[in-house]
Amino acid sequence: MFQTLIQKVWVPMKPYYTQVYQEIWVGVGLMSLIVYKIRSADKRSKALKGPAPAHGHH
């Protein structure tokens, strides 16, 4: 299902995206990387502090 969606949407728009939005995709990639780093660091700091009693699913 997902592959057919990519084929229907991505293939006709691929040259347009690669030319026009290349800089935007680089920015999006960097932003997602930064967000991922922050989230992983946040999880690590929470894990070091120990399980929070409010969550209770640990």
UniProtKB/Swiss-Prot annotation:
Keywords: Membrane, Mitochondrion, Transmembrane, Transmembrane helix. The chain crosses the membrane at residues 22-39. One of its GO terms (cellular component) is proton-transporting ATP synthase complex. It comes from the Eukaryota. It is found in: Mitochondrion membrane. The keyword Membrane applies. Its main location: mitochondrion. It holds the Pfam family Mit_proteolip. Belongs to the small mitochondrial proteolipid family. Subunit j, of the mitochondrial membrane ATP synthase complex (F(1)F(0) ATP synthase or Complex V) that produces ATP from ADP in the presence of a proton gradient across the membrane which is generated by electron transport complexes of the respiratory chain. ATP synthase complex consist of a soluble F(1) head domain - the catalytic core - and a membrane F(1) domain - the membrane proton channel. These two domains are linked by a central stalk rotating inside the F(1) region and a stationary peripheral stalk. Component of the ATP synthase complex composed at least of ATP5F1A/subunit alpha, ATP5F1B/subunit beta, ATP5MC1/subunit c (homooctomer), MT-ATP6/subunit a, MT-ATP8/subunit 8, ATP5ME/subunit e, ATP5MF/subunit f, ATP5MG/subunit g, ATP5MK/subunit k, ATP5MJ/subunit j, ATP5F1C/subunit gamma, ATP5F1D/subunit delta, ATP5F1E/subunit epsilon, ATP5PF/subunit F6, ATP5PB/subunit b, ATP5PD/subunit d, ATP5PO/subunit OSCP. This is ATP synthase F(0) complex subunit j, mitochondrial.
